[in-house]
Amino acid sequence: MDPCKFRPSSSFDTKTTTTNAGQPVWNDNEALTVGPRGPILLEDYHLLEKIAHFARERIPERVVHARGASAKGFFECTHDVTGLTCADFLRAPGARTPVIVRFSTVIHERGSPETIRDPRGFAVKFYTREGNWDLLGNNFPVFFIRDGIKFPDVIHAFKPNPKSHVQEYWRVFDFLSHHPESLHTFFFLFDDVGIPTDYRHMDGFGVNTYTFVSRAGKSHYVKFHWRPTCGVSCLMDDEATLVGGKNHSHATQDLYDSIDAGNFPEWKLFVQVIDPDEEDRFDFDPLDDTKTWPEDLVPLQPVGRLVLDRNVDNFFNENEQLAFGPGLVVPGIYYSDDKMLQCRVFAYADTQRYRLGPNYLMLPVNAPKCGFKNNHYDGAMNFMHRDEEVDYYPSRHAPLRHAEPASFPVPTRPVVGKREKTRIKKENDFVQPGERYRSWAPDRQDRFVRRFSDALAHPKVSHELRVIWIDFLSKCDKSCGMKVANRLNVKPSM
């Protein structure tokens, strides 16, 4: 029997019900009992299998980004970037690559409203000819912290109180009062862009700094930007309350219905690049994910377009079992020493192994569409057909060999230093948030002040914490801090 032809698929559905092993089920309406009113018999294998499977339908939800929706489509390279990267899928304008994209909220559980003031995830899996590349980002270009060792803490602070299971902002302000670098993200979260109208009308950002590597081995730091062709649209607070009260899944439904109607969402991909030899000319660290790269200093360069033209065939298979990881890169794209990215490379793969199992990359939605070969054998739920006799390397009995080093160039800059746990030198946490605030119209500034003040007004936010945050805001913009202080009737310390 062909081991691949009859692998489980709805393509081979029978006309009558069966067990998972294929035995006919002659009655799926009544359990097997002793007489019409007698006890149920344990020999009713179909009943036991049905109940046991039902009890195990749910898998652990993602610790973050649990609430999400996916769609499929393609990425098309539209501009020549071969001088920056040797990535095959960017080899020439017109080259197309199949993709699957997952949008999500961040903090709350699966099934929570999609109108919550919360960052949105924007993750893209490129099925390239040289393996899968996962670009994971958010709709904000910055993050709350810059060092991955604090990632569990910041998520714990935003998650519901472990005692009451209620999300409370006093916990957020308490923790992040030790991390003023979080201010920049707050100037997005409490801004008008804090609640996207839907997934089609929001930006996407890679957030972390990656590295482009050219065929010649030249490296450039790179940041990725997605811009929707239909423009950015967001909900005001009262609109979000109204929309969320009617439909908790409005963004998921909008994405599905739009694609179903032939109104395909599209984004343009842009990059910013910095020569590592010139990084010292900036007043911030280019590897700090709490900072943006000013577009007047580092202009956007067009790369391609992303089009979503197909809905998923099955939500569980292609959304819940869909697994992303920043560690999945392809030749021409590499990591940087961004501290958050370095931690994410391990963390995401590890959480997928917990959530889906050690062979999660064998699941059809996660498997590459190109050929692949390694000696990773066995493990729970391994369903890959293999008939080799050699499962080690090297061997004189098997033709497996290493890829040529030139096929996967990596950055070659030397790294020299002593072992230490320390902060980066160029923190500069208040300049960019202040510049962003001053770029807004007065009414937009007022809405930000109101939202921030309302959050700080939580009864468990102490006077000390309010003074700290007003001091932070004042360092960004003196008038902003003063307005928040006046709303809270707090005298600022400066």
Swiss-Prot record:
One of its GO terms (molecular function) is catalase activity. Residues 8-22 have a biased composition (Polar residues). InterPro entries: Catalase, Catalase_AS, Catalase_clade1/3, Catalase_core, Catalase_haem_BS, Catalase_immune_responsive, Catalase_sf. It catalyses: 2 H2O2 = O2 + 2 H2O. Occurs in almost all aerobically respiring organisms and serves to protect cells from the toxic effects of hydrogen peroxide. This is Catalase isozyme 2. GO terms for biological process: hydrogen peroxide catabolic process; response to hormone; response to hydrogen peroxide. Homotetramer. SMART domains: Catalase (SM01060). Residues 1-29 are annotated as: Disordered. Heme binds at residue 348. It comes from the Eukaryota. The keyword Electron transport does not apply. Gene3D superfamilies: Catalase core domain. It is an enzyme of class 1 (oxidoreductase). Signal peptide: none annotated. Its cofactor is heme. Pfam families: Catalase, Catalase-rel. Keywords: Glyoxysome, Heme, Hydrogen peroxide, Iron, Metal-binding, Oxidoreductase, Peroxidase, Peroxisome. Belongs to the catalase family. One of its GO terms (cellular component) is glyoxysome. Its EC number is 1.11.1.6. The keyword Transcription does not apply. It is found in: Peroxisome; Glyoxysome. The gene is CAT2. The active site is at residues 65, 138.
